Amino acid sequence: MKRHLNILGRLQGAGALPFADEFLPLAERATYEALEALSPTRCAGCERAGALICQDCLTSLVLIDPRHSCTRCGAPFGDLLCTECSVEGTSSAMAEALDRCLTCAVYAHPLPRIIKAYKDAGERRLAPYLAELLYDTALHAQVAAPDRYGSVLSGADAVVFVPATAAAFRRRGFDHMEAIARSFCDLSGVSLLDALVKYGHGDQRELGRDERREHARGMNETVEDVRGCRLLLIDDVITTGATMAAAAAELKRAGAAAVDGLAVARVW
C-alpha cells in the first residue's frame, strides 16, 4: 500500500536520528557516531540496535484505513459509524464535540512500546517520527477519502494539541504533545496555536470509561482567541475519547467554528 511506502521512505531514511545524519556538522556527526559506538540507538518497539524505529516495526504498524474508519471516534472498521457510535447515545461526547476524528493506527504492537518510550522513558527523538505518522495519515485521508476527510489538514486554520497536566509535565520534564505538534506544524505548514491549559493531576490510564469522562470534564481552559477558527486537535492515544472530547468541547465553547481530531493511536 502506498501509504506504508510513504511512511517508510521518509522515516526510515532518517535512520537512528530524527533527521538524516549527513546534514549534521562534521564535529556533531563525529560525536554522534562515537556515542552510537558506545551505546547504540535501539528500536523503541523491539530493542533491536540500529534505528530509533526499525523497518520491521514500521511495517508492523496496523494502519487504519480512512475509507473504512468511524468518522466520529476514529475507530477502525466503521464504514459509516463503528459498532459503538452506531448505537444511540454511545460516544456522544466525541460526536458532539468533534466534527470529525481521524486516527493513524490501532494501539497494538509496536505502538504501545513506542509511545511509552517517548512519554515515560524520555526518548524525545521520537517526536518527529510520531509527527510524521500524523502528517502522513492526514495527507492520505484527504486523498483516499475526500468525502469523509477532505480538507482535514488543508482546511485547518491552526493546530492545537491536547496539553499535559502540570503533574505530568513535572514528571516527564516536557509536554509530549507540544513537541509532536511543533514537528507536525513544521511538516504541514499549518500554524501552531498553544490554546489550551489543562488542570487536574490524575493519571487516566487506569480509569474506566465512565471515570475517564468524569475526570476529563472541566479540565481544560482556552487561553488564546479561537473564535471562528477551524482547528485540528491532536493527541497521542484515544481510548474512550473522553480527553479529546473534553478538549474539543472547550474549544467550541470558546468560539471555534470547527474542531477535527487527529490521534496517533486508537484503542480498539
Predicted stretch roles:
Residues M1-W268:
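Glycine-rich phosphate/pyrophosphate-handling loop used in enzymes and phosphotransfer proteins
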